Amino acid sequence: MTRLLDASFLLLPVIASTLFGTASAQSTCATKGKPAGKVLQGYWENWDGSANGVHPGFGWTPIENPVIAQNGYNVINAAFPVILSDGTALWEDGMDATVKVATPAEMCQAKAAGATILMSIGGATAGIDLSSSTVADKFISTIVPILKQYNFDGIDIDIETGLVGSGSIGTLSTSQANLIRIIDGVLAQMPANFGLTMAPETAYVTGGSVVYGSIWGSYLPIIKKYVDNGRLWWLNMQYYNGDMYGCSGDSYAAGTVQGFTAQTDCLNNGITIQGTTIKVPYNMQVPGLPAQSGAGGGYMTPALVGQAWDHYNGALKGLMTWSINWDGSKNWTFGDN
């Protein structure tokens, strides 16, 4: 048994080399600009969701695994860095339970095979203290070297805690100002074609049509800034995990074609808050959906996703999903459809 195990471990580098490339691959590669065509964007989990029982059957996988592209994904959101209380960003093996990050060479290999790779900042459990400009500056100073070393093509803002509006659309709250400080601070130090996407929950966007303040609509002035200045690639609003408001105070259940189209049309036509209108045209929308039942509330079957997509006759930029790993655990029925 010992000899068999030893032989197996000796074969692992050969197998890995055959499947995913070699350790001699280049460790630096150019920043890729915004994809010209349609995108299928998925979150790549840097932890093992199979080992912890969340989605058995497909856990952690190399970011350069060709099965990702084979099932349609051409934009990858690497989720998530650990952010310490002082704002220090970490991106390394073991920074959290079962976490393993891709090496710079593996990132280049995935990019050479067609992927555009963004770092997703935030998530439900990886927030940042937006009340402090000192914390914001510490985050900028520690995340930028990581973005450069690991050959990221952009950042995805997935902040889900700590962002609140001031109550006046024309006046930024401290947290809004500090999130803009972070985004501007990162973009200023990266190449001009470095990307920016955002993945807010609906409450932070269309929820502002009901009342503007606290979390409700708190992304709106930030979205407007980066739509207007041309730096936002697209918006990945999350069409899941709760009912969704339209532009007129109307409400729709997640997981329905009606809710999908109401949200999408609302963004395209514009949300007017206190006399200020925020628009996100169809070609800057990449709506977010759960890849599988269990990945998030409001799951839509492939047939329903197809109906929603076809309704726009190709006008949307693409679709986003949580997550690549969830999709792989259920035979890729999101990506393949």
Swiss-Prot record:
The active site is at residue 160. GO terms for molecular function: chitin binding; endochitinase activity. PANTHER family: ENDOCHITINASE. It comes from the Eukaryota. It is found in: Secreted. It comes from Trichoderma harzianum. Coiled coil: none annotated. Belongs to the glycosyl hydrolase 18 family. Chitinase class V subfamily. Secreted chitinase involved in the degradation of chitin, a component of the cell walls of fungi and exoskeletal elements of some animals (including worms and arthropods). Plays a morphogenetic role during apical growth, cell division and differentiation (cell wall morphogenesis). May be involved in the degradation and further assimilation of phytopathogenic fungi, namely mycoparasitism, the major mechanism accounting for the antagonistic activity against phytopathogenic fungi displayed by Trichoderma. This is Endochitinase 37. It is an enzyme of class 3 (hydrolase). Residues 38-337 form the GH18 domain. Induction: Specifically induced by chitin. GO terms for biological process: chitin catabolic process; polysaccharide catabolic process.
